[in-house]
């Protein structure tokens, strides 16, 4: 019988290392200057910056260590899995429609009672050992596709690698359209740290001089293929841009690291890059920080709350539940940095209740958990470009990100139906597999001929629209439901508003308009948004500001109420954009007052 590579990933080395580190790291085993919760982009950058500055750091991660040489299956052939990389029997992901129509908690629903493991939509044969089991990690409330990973590096092990900067349009959005408030910092404040991150970690792209997507310090980018060049020329007549994607990938190499090599153009980055070209927190940040001798990593450490001392405005450490033994331990340090991800960080703070902080730590404003924001997604379109119909197939695969159509709404003009904006990502040409074959009718020789005919000509795009940061979009603790470790879970109260739905309609109309302008054939448009949370870009639940009455953190991401607790993830972000959050640069800037 054929060997199923999906089930043959040997985790022995990672599991043994995880147990060793957890066993040897106790509250009494050392003294640390800073505790950092989380090991992904947020916790990784905070730990790296502090450790390199000579600060003794304890990194607490809820998951296990990772063996990237074994678990990053970049070079696995498609035929190595009998199920085309779908989950094995007994495990299943939550389907798109199930997020909206299945009663919550998802993992506890009768629909999944025969499943041994229930994963989010991001669960597949490559991520199944990283993403959480929804039965152990339930959530309640309105539908929300919350993707979580419990392994060293978190979601950076399979992120989308888009590395786009926020700019003045984002930091000063409220001044432009009158909705909500501006950030307490500007693009000029953050730009030097964007530049530092680009140099340290590598960012591939092209300089375009566009206000809506500021340029960075770029390495060599991927090129547009024939289909994409034809599309670019067509929409240029409409005043719109189509540029190579900007990727958190080193194509020319980075200095001072033995864990990363330059991109080899293999294109399977979502499985984890086993040469370290794509940014992953372990190889880019955590291992170099550990090599400094200043970083201690303790896996299997579920932080349930931040502890406050007799002085109610000072934290003294965190409470940890060992993921395996269930032992409860209190780790102490003068400073605590939360980088568990926007929603998990918020959950920890909400659960950090005391006589002095009855509604959670840092919640004197009552805004902790409010202003949840992300991207509205699912609007997409496709067609076939005449220039490539019936031509020979070419090698168009291997790029770390797809090309990008920057925002073109509400920049110099004002749309009558909505504020803020959106962008598209997508491309064309011959990928690893002709997925469009599923939509070509017929069978036999004629079917195969048509697949070959249209395979080189496909082009498709998906939209990302900004969700406005509304106070009523929020999370809170559910007093009646707990996770497998006895910690109250999050209850969501989150919905797309009128602005997002009108924006989504314009997205669909715009992509149809552009495909027609490019004379594409057999145009198909999907107008239905995906469930909330699909973008994995949640931000804003501990927003920053100068006034403690209207914000949770200051402009350095430090709690107004407790001056020695910092947030390293996207929870302090005031508003979003039509792109991924400016995470690593803000973490670098936010760490300066500590080091």
Q: Predicted regions span which residues?
A:
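A conserved FAD-binding loop/helix module that cradles the flavin
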Residues: 575-593
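A glycine-rich dinucleotide-binding beta-alpha-beta segment and adjacent secondary-structure elements
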Residues: 31, 244-248, 262-269, 304-307, ...
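Glycine-rich loop(s) and the adjacent beta-strand/alpha-helix scaffold that form part
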Residues: 52, 56, 62-89, 292, ...
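Extreme N-terminal leader/targeting segments of oxidoreductases
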Residues: 1-34, 52-53, 67-85, 89-91, ...
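N-terminal Rossmann-like FAD-binding beta1-loop-alpha1 element of flavoenzymes
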Residues: 34-59
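Conserved redox-cofactor binding core of oxidoreductases
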Residues: 2-6, 83-145, 150-151, 155-170, ...
């Amino acid at each position: 019988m054929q060997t199923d590579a999906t089930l043959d990933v040997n985790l022995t080395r990672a599991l043994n290392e995880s147990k060793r580190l957890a066993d040897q790291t106790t509250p009494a085993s050392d003294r640390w200057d800073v505790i950092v919760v989380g090991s992904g982009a947020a916790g990784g950058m905070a730990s790296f910056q502090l450790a390199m500055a000579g600060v003794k750091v304890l990194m607490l991660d809820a998951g296990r260590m990772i063996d990237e040489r074994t678990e990053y299956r970049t070079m696995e052939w498609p035929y190595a899995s009998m199920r085309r990389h779908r989950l094995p029997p007994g495990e299943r992901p939550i389907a798109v429609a199930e997020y909206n129509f299945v009663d919550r908690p998802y993992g506890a629903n009768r629909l999944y009672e025969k499943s041994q493991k229930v994963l989010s939509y991001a669960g597949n044969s490559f991520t199944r050992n990283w993403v959480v089991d929804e039965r152990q990690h339930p959530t309640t409330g309105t539908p929300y596709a919350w993707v979580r990973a419990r392994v060293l590096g978190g979601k950076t092990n399979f992120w989308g690698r888009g590395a786009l900067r926020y700019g003045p349009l984002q930091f000063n959005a409220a001044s432009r359209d009158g909705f909500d408030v501006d950030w307490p910092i500007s693009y000029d404040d953050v730009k030097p740290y964007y530049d530092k991150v680009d140099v340290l970690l590598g960012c591939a792209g092209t300089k375009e001089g566009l206000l809506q997507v500021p340029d960075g310090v770029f390495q060599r980018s991927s090129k547009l293929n024939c289909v994409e060049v034809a599309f670019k020329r067509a929409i240029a007549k409409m005043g719109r841009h189509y540029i190579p994607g900007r990727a958190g990938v080193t194509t020319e190499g980075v200095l001072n690291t033995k864990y990363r090599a330059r991109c080899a153009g293999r294109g399977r980055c979502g499985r984890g890059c086993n040469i370290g070209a794509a940014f992953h927190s372990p190889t880019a940040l955590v291992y170099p920080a550990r090599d400094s001798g200043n970083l201690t990593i303790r896996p299997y450490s579920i932080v349930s709350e931040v502890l406050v001392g007799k002085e109610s405005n000072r934290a003294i450490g965190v409470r940890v539940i060992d993921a395996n033994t269930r032992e409860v331990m209190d780790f102490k340090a003068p400073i605590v940095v939360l980088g568990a991800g926007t929603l998990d960080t918020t959950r920890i703070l909400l659960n950090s209740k005391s006589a002095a902080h009855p509604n959670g730590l840092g919640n004197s404003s009552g805004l902790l958990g409010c202003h949840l924001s992300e991207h509205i997604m699912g609007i997409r379109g496709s067609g076939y470009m005449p220039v490539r119909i019936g031509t020979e197939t070419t090698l168009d695969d291997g790029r770390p990100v797809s090309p990008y159509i920057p925002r073109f709404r509400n920049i110099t003009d004002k749309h009558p139906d909505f504020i803020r904006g959106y962008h598209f990502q997508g491309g064309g040409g011959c990928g690893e597999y002709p997925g469009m074959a599923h939509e070509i009718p017929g069978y036999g020789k004629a079917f195969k001929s048509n697949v070959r005919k249209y395979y080189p000509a496909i082009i498709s795009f998906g939209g990302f629209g900004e969700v406005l940061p509304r106070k009523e979009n929020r999370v809170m603790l559910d007093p009646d439901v707990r996770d497998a470790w006895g910690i109250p879970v999050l209850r969501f109260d989150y919905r797309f508003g009128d602005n997002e739905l009108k924006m989504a309609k314009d997205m669909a109309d715009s992509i149809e308009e552009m495909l027609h302008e490019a004379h594409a054939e057999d145009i198909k448009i999907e107008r239905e948004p995906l469930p909330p949370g699909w973008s994995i870009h949640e931000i804003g639940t501990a927003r920053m500001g100068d006034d403690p009455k209207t914000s949770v953190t200051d402009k350095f991401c430090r709690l107004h109420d407790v001056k020695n607790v910092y947030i390293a993830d996207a929870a302090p972000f005031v508003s979003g954009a039509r792109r991924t959050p400016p995470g690593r640069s803000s973490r670098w800037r936010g760490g300066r007052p500590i080091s």
